[in-house]
Amino acid sequence: MPIIEQVGAREILDSRGNPTVEVEVALTDGTFARAAVPSGASTGEHEAVELRDGGSRYGGKGVEKAVEAVLDEIAPQVIGLSADDQRLVDQALLDLDGTPDKSRLGANAILGVSLAVSKAAAESAGLPLFRYIGGPNAHILPVPMMNILNGGAHADTGVDVQEFMVAPIGAPSFKEALRWGAEVYHSLKSVLKNQGLATGLGDEGGFAPDVAGTKAALDLISSAIEATGLKLGSDVALALDVAATEFYTEGSGYAFEKETRTAEQMAEFYAGLLDSYPLVSIEDPLSEDDWDGWVSLTAAIGDRIQLVGDDLFVTNPERLEDGIQRGAANALLVKVNQIGTLTETLDAVSLAHNSGYRTMMSHRSGETEDTTIADLAVAVGSGQIKTGAPARSERVAKYNQLLRIEETLGDAARYAGDLAFPRLEAK
């Protein structure tokens, strides 16, 4: 039985140059593992709380308090526990924090320990992380939802939609899907250059041109796909992360594309997009607390497209259960740092799958070189992963880990492809 012997922590930098927490765990059998915690730019109101230092250091974003929480409070509580009992370890973390939103110790401190323990236990068992968490049947490689054009909170432009993604659903393998996505990415750069548009990058590696709006951006990406010789729709589909909470104001509605719109008008806009473009997924099309709007939208177009709750659910089993009962959305975005422990993340995924909801594993805009979510995507069979453009090493690290996993699985590997999107309509 591998016992936790040492727990260490430090402040490191994420991909935006902001501090984050890294945790190291050593077991009595000599096993060692490390995990780094990501952070988001557009964060949901209901997410677990990151502990930041405040003050002038790092503009108030330092995490020395979270590091101290790991070293002074968490370590004494988990040292001596069995690393292979993840639920026991995570419950000890929750009990120690004692708040519903992890605000005392910080979700960044708690998650770092939770993930490092799981990685150490996998190492001790001599298993890849995806196999340790997912068991012998974990074999589905996810469709990479590549954010190749950035807007919203991820870019300083007038584009309101936060992410425009390509999904290589027609590829025969993850390796080929990655190639297709990379070729479309480079093709888009050429399309932008030819039109005199900027090719600077946003937080997640996608281009951030200042284009007229949603349809103009989708047209650019469609042209880039077709320029590679791939078929728009059957080979490579499109997806959006609207992040609508960012432009919603209670009482006045959605300030979208120079108009103030109601939830019903937003729904009409999305229905129009479905008629014109091969979209397979829309994330956060409405605000995180617009439950009535979500229910109406799901009833209107939920049989035609995947509607993903990110800010709506914040990977929280309780909010997800509420949404399932109401009939809001039909898919869950999974971000481990939104909820703060591996166990709660796995519980949310299980609830989603058992309720007929799809799941999409996701990074954050502030990432590190940690590749845990790549293993998690395969472990839980999510069939979809969102980890940015095929550029910037903190994004590519996850894609490269999935290449390794596909190679490890050999003939047992299966690429999810269009089966990840059962609502897909041929266009």
From Swiss-Prot:
Source superkingdom = Bacteria
- Cystines in this chain: none
Function as written in the Swiss-Prot or TrEMBL entry:
Catalyzes the reversible conversion of 2-phosphoglycerate (2-PG) into phosphoenolpyruvate (PEP). It is essential for the degradation of carbohydrates via glycolysis.
Decide whether keyword S-adenosyl-L-methionine is in the record: no
Q: What is this protein called?
A: Enolase
Q: Give compartment(s).
A: Cytoplasm; Secreted; Cell surface
Which pathway does the UniProt entry assign to this protein?
Carbohydrate degradation; glycolysis; pyruvate from D-glyceraldehyde 3-phosphate: step 4/5
The lineage, from the top, is: Bacteria, Bacillati, Actinomycetota, Actinomycetes, Mycobacteriales
Similarity comment: family membership = Belongs to the enolase family.
Application in biotechnology: Binds 2-aminothiazole antibiotics, which are antitubercular drugs. This protein may be a possible drug target.
Q: What class of enzyme is it?
A: lyase
Q: How is the cofactor bound?
A: Binds a second Mg(2+) ion via substrate during catalysis.
Which HAMAP family does this UniProt record tie to the protein? Enolase
What NCBIfam families has UniProt attached to this entry?
eno
Keyword Cell membrane among UniProt keywords: no
Task: List, alphabetically, the Pfam families matched.
Answer: Enolase_C, Enolase_N
What positions does the entry give for Mg(2+) binding? 241, 283, 310
GO CC annotations on file: cell surface; extracellular region; phosphopyruvate hydratase complex
Listed under GO biological process in this entry are: glycolytic process
Primary location group: cytoplasm
The active site lies at 204 (proton donor), 335 (proton acceptor)
Catalytic activity, EC? 4.2.1.11
Q: Which organism is it from?
A: Mycolicibacterium smegmatis (strain ATCC 700084 / mc(2)155) (Mycobacterium smegmatis)
